[in-house]
């Protein structure tokens, strides 16, 4: 631990020696961070795209006068005049205004071709707008959108299972705000768990994924929740053929919150028909954050999705679902070093019974507690070093009873540790 702190101190100290422009890019209407915004110095072409936190760093700048250009699709171009002094760093947070994109004359200009060093193959970023525009069954669905992408197949027309480049559906790593979701589907795989109005972005990596991801063979789907509107309170609701949905959001102490929920209503429509089992499912997805200081952010994410089936005629009862809870702390140690710390818990369970309390009952449970630390060190304008570690405490429980008699019980509690370092 002592050596680790020494390394952090050295990185922080080294990061303070060069001329740097750094900061966060956000949406002016809501305060949400903009991922992938382009930040470039007009005179030199130096710049980068913002990371998952909306953070950017431009280094090794020669003293002089510059124009900083910030652009993002759907937002107006922002230009800032800057004067750079030797050895002096500038922290500049910029909020972009939304703009209607007009199709007009396109003028393409270019200077000397530069080497593209940050290309990642097989990576696709999906926005809520793309999810809502894609064909879907009953209502917009993230997994249905992904199934329309190249290299992605499905097991059947009625399944949201993702078969990516020949892998099985259980070989994909599904993450929601850094937390593993073990069974992200409802109604036997017909609908996915995630509420589109509560999703900020979904990143699909179909192969050659980065060192920080592990534990699966096929692909990675990293889902990021919306952060909420920091400027004002607002809400919306809609009704589809499948469910009723609502989303509320608003400002919180130096931050924002958002709450999304949905529930199907088939059980209410057919409750007078004894031949149709009263089945329903619901999802609740929320996120809240607070910028405690300009360098520190604390956030909390929660998800709960349950399927419930009760068919009294045959004594059949079933209940299964997922629940995740995560706490994240982000710290900007210096212009060049940013760290993210995570504590998370993920639970997946199934409960099935046939014949009531005197019949056959089966319970299955996966409990995942995770602690992780990830760092990004912007070493230079040409390279970024990412490193981190993760510890998982897993619990697997499977029991089967017949009446009051325990048929069998299987319980294991393995642990996993992983660390990584990569140069980008």
What residue ranges belong to the model's regions?
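Short, acidic Ser/Thr/Gly-rich low-complexity loop/linker segments typical of extracellular
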Residues: 44-55
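Short acidic/polar hinge/loop motifs at secondary-structure boundaries
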Residues: 57-60, 133, 179-206, 274-279
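Extracytoplasmic beta-strand/coil segments of soluble accessory domains associated
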Residues: 134-137, 143-183, 200
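Hydrophobic, lipid-facing positions within transmembrane beta-strands of outer-membrane proteins
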Residues: 160, 217-219, 233-235, 242-246, ...
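Periplasmic-side early beta-strands and strand-to-turn transitions of outer-membrane beta-barrels
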Residues: 229-231, 251-322, 350-351
């Amino acid at each position: 631990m002592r050596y680790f702190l020494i390394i952090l101190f050295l990185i922080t100290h080294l990061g303070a020696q060069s001329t740097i422009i750094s900061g966060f890019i956000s949406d002016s209407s809501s305060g949400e961070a903009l991922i992938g915004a382009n930040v470039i110095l007009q005179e030199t072409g130096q710049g980068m795209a913002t990371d998952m936190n909306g953070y950017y760093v431009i280094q090794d700048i020669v003293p002089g006068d510059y124009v900083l250009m910030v652009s993002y699709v759907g937002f107006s171009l922002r230009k800032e005049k800057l004067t750079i002094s030797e050895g002096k760093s500038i922290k500049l947070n910029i909020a972009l205004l939304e703009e209607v994109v007009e199709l007009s004359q396109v003028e393409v200009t270019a200077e000397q071709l530069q080497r593209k060093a940050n290309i990642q193959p097989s990576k696709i970023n999906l926005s809520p707008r793309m999810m809502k525009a894609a064909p879907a069954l009953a209502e917009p669905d993230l997994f249905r959108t992904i199934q329309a992408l190249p290299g992605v197949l499905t097991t059947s027309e009625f399944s949201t299972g993702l078969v990516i480049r020949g892998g099985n559906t259980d070989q994909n790593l599904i993450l929601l705000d850094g937390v593993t979701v073990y069974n992200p589907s409802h109604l036997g795989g017909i609908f996915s768990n995630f509420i589109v109005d509560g999703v900020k972005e979904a990143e699909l990596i179909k192969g050659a994924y980065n060192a920080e991801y592990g534990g699966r063979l096929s692909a990675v789907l990293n889902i990021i929740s919306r952060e909420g509107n920091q400027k004002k309170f607002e809400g919306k609701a809609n009704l589809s053929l499948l469910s009723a949905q609502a989303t509320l959001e608003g400002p919180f102490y130096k931050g924002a919150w958002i709450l999304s929920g949905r529930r199907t209503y088939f059980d209410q429509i057919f409750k007078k028909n004894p031949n149709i089992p009263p089945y329903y499912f619901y999802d609740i997805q929320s996120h809240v954050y607070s910028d405690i200081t300009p360098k520190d952010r604390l956030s909390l994410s929660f998800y709960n999705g349950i399927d419930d089936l009760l068919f009294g005629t045959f004594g059949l009862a079933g209940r299964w679902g997922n629940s995740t809870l995560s706490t994240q702390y982000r710290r900007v140690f210096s212009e060049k070093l940013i760290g993210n710390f995570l504590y998370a818990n993920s639970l997946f369970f199934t409960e099935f019974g046939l014949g009531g309390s005197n019949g056959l009952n089966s319970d299955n449970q996966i409990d995942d507690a995770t602690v992780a630390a990830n760092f990004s060190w912007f070493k230079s304008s040409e390279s970024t070093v990412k490193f981190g570690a993760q510890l998982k405490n897993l619990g697997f429980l499977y029991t089967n009873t017949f009446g009051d008699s325990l048929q069998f019980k299987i319980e294991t509690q393995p642990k996993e540790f992983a660390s990584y370092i990569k140069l980008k």
